């Protein structure tokens, strides 16, 4: 196996996290007496080009490539008619590049799109039908929201309201606009002018929605969540992607996320001996890079089973990043468990008991 990752340059920290996870799974298999391949590690950043990196892999007598991690390089691969070696890319190509994808290219990563679809399905099975959606006003936020909206509508749900927010210190105007609290206050002002006298008034939020889809990072989420309480919407269930959780428990800060349900990797919600060992040897594995370590673990366990997943359409592998399955284009999709913030801590939800 040639493990092709960026180990220098801008993506070096991410590449090293994936490498450490991959090698930890390798050594665990070795200790258990399983047959393991010889691993050669290639730095895609210093190789000069993807073509040269594959040249190195062939010179090292690799039979498989795991990597690259960089999305631009995965797009390059997807545009080729044939690959020099069968490849498990650790990212997803853009849809435009997918049209003539080579047969021996498989794609696996931590797709936010998968999470958005899962949330739509979870909310629908919980009986919710009309959503209020809040997402960042950038290309990533719009892309993930678009995937969510498409899937939500296909299930039979509807969108009561939607707001894209810019990064700022105060998100109250965005929440008020989404909840139509401003309209309630404007109506009061009109009535008061017409009647020419003061009257008792309590602003109201819109009543045509039964849940909220929130796409936010922890810092924004901690500011946004309390604003729903402040604007008379504390009773609306809020669902979010894994981006709402930093990956490291912080009760003091995350108490502001209480009640938010989110989907995340089993790696972060469950205990395992391998996870404890990785965290002991790599302090960064406890924070923002935790998910990339987990991705490395699953990349090692996934590559020998790709043919099985391809041949058996409904088969799954139970990985540390979720239950993994493959579509007809060779893309790996994940199903993940859900958790809820309770007293500032993420607590796994046992879906079987609901």
Task: Describe these PLM feature segments.
Residues 1-15, 131-133:
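Short beta-strand segments enriched in small/hydrophobic residues
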Residues 13-18, 32-96:
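Beta-alpha junction/loop-to-helix N-cap segments that form part of ligand/metal-binding clefts
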Residues 29-44, 102-106, 153-188:
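Short beta-strand elements in bilobed, periplasmic/extracellular small-molecule ligand-binding domains
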Residues 36-59, 115-118, 168-178, 195-198, ...:
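Structural motif
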Residues 58-70, 87-90, 130-136, 160, ...:
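Periplasmic-binding protein-like
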Residues 64-163:
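Extracytoplasmic ligand/sensor domains, especially the bilobed periplasmic-binding protein
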Residues 281-347:
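Segments of small-molecule ligand-sensing domains
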């Amino acid at each position: 196996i040639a493990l092709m990752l960026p180990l220098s340059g801008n993506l070096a920290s991410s590449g090293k996290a994936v490498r450490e996870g991959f090698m930890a799974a390798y050594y665990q298999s070795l200790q258990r007496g399983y047959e393991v391949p010889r691993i050669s590690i290639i730095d895609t950043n210093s190789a000069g080009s993807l073509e040269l990196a594959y040249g190195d892999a062939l010179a090292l007598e690799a039979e498989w490539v795991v990597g690259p991690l960089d999305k631009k390089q995965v797009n390059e691969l997807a545009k080729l008619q044939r690959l020099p070696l069968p490849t498990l890319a650790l990212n997803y190509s853009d849809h435009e590049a997918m049209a003539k994808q080579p047969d021996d290219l498989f794609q696996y990563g931590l797709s936010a799109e998968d999470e958005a679809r899962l949330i739509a399905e979870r909310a629908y099975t919980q009986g919710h039908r009309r959503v209020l959606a809040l997402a960042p006003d950038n290309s990533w936020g719009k892309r993930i929201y678009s995937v969510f909206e498409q899937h939500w509508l296909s299930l039979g749900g509807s969108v009561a309201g939607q707001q894209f927010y810019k990064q700022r210190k105060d998100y109250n105007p965005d929440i008020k606009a989404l909840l139509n609290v401003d309209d309630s206050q404007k109506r009061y002002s009109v009535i008061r002018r017409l009647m020419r006298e003061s009257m008792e008034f309590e602003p109201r939020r819109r009543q045509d929605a039964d849940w909220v889809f929130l796409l936010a990072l922890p810092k924004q989420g901690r500011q946004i969540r309390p604003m729903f309480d402040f604007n008379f919407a504390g009773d609306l269930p809020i669902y979010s992607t894994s981006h709402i959780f930093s990956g490291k428990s912080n009760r003091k800060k995350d108490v502001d996320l209480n009640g938010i349900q989110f989907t995340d990797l089993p790696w972060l919600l469950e205990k395992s001996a391998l996870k404890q060992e990785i965290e002991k040897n790599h302090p960064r594995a406890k924070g923002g890079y935790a998910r990339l370590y987990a991705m490395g673990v699953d990349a090692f366990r996934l590559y020998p089973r790709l043919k099985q997943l391809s041949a058996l359409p409904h088969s799954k592998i139970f990985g540390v990043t979720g239950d993994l399955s493959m579509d007809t284009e060779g893309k790996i999709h994940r199903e993940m468990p859900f958790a809820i913030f309770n007293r500032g801590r993420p607590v796994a939800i046992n879906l079987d008991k609901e």
